Swiss-Prot record:
Chain residues that bind Ca(2+) 6: D279, D281, D283, K285, E290
Binding positions for Ca(2+) 1 per the UniProt entry: D82, D84, D86, Y88, E93
Keywords: Calcium, Endoplasmic reticulum, Glycoprotein, Golgi apparatus, Membrane, Metal-binding, Repeat, Sarcoplasmic reticulum, Secreted, Signal
SMART domains on file: EFh
Residues annotated for Ca(2+) 2 binding in this entry: D118, N120, D122, E129
Gene designation per UniProt: calub
Phylogenetic lineage: Eukaryota, Metazoa, Chordata, Craniata, Vertebrata
Binding site for Ca(2+) 3: D165, D167, D169, K171, E176
GO terms for MF: calcium ion binding
Protein name according to UniProt: Calumenin-B
Subcellular location: Endoplasmic reticulum membrane; Golgi apparatus; Secreted; Melanosome
Amino acid sequence: MELRPLVMCFALCVVYASSKPTIEKKDRVHHDDPLSSRDHEDAENFDYDHEAFLGQDEAKTFDQLTPEESKERLGMLVERIDEDKDGYVSVEEMKKWIKHSQKRWIYDDVDRQWKGHDHNGDGLVSWEEYKNATYGYILDDPDPEDGFSYRQMISRDERRFKMSDLDADLKANKEEFTAFLHPEEYDHMKDIVVLETMEDIDKNGDGFIDLEEYIGDMYNQEGDPSEPEWVRTEREQFTEFRDTNKDGRMDKEETKDWILPSDYDHAEAEAKHLVYESDNDKDGKLTKAEIVEKYDLFVGSQATDFGEALARHDEF
């Protein structure tokens, strides 16, 4: 499939979209999604814990297993969670596993894109492979009349690729490629997320985001003389909270505080909860036996699912 028509279509869509008033608010803030849509009510059931520990889809799979099958598969998971292979699962290892389970869609996306970029099959995606697969012959035939600078886009991608390339060999392994495609998920990539956001919003090129640039990124008032209430609220937010040093503009640190807030760490809280509830000898870490013994806290099975079905039936 040729890339040029796709890229041109994208460019035209963006130009068309930018010419229409934007009523709905654009949100650049990166928030962690909740671990589960269920209420965390362990006195009634462990549905929240199951979805937090496994992810929603995998939790449903466990609900169809017998208790014996559920325990066996849980035991296999424990061996993966115990990264340092010391025979224990620490709070930190549990936290990392929960985060991994919650972000499984990201890894699925990376796997899908990986197949289209690792052309030589060496298990790495080089910068050249990515650039050629993404931009193709646009490199040789840029069209400046469409208002887009593809060379500028390539330069921006290359900068992000190099930031994700921790060993600086211009070849990305799976983890580095994940950081490149989803930089907001990695601490060492957060500065590039901030920089790219500022470049998008900073129209006068002074390296800051002023009030009008901030509002202009969220709302296009063309053809609409009156501002929605949320726009007036955002003006107040900028003045009272975003611009912390009160100089009328946001610098890099203020922008970072805005788009990458320090949210409550749900994964860490759940990891501590699971360890506390299962830690029989209270040494602050879990053995495989301790986890499997409390298997119904971590995973479901036909037995727990049937029990909850009976409980729901009794309510009626």
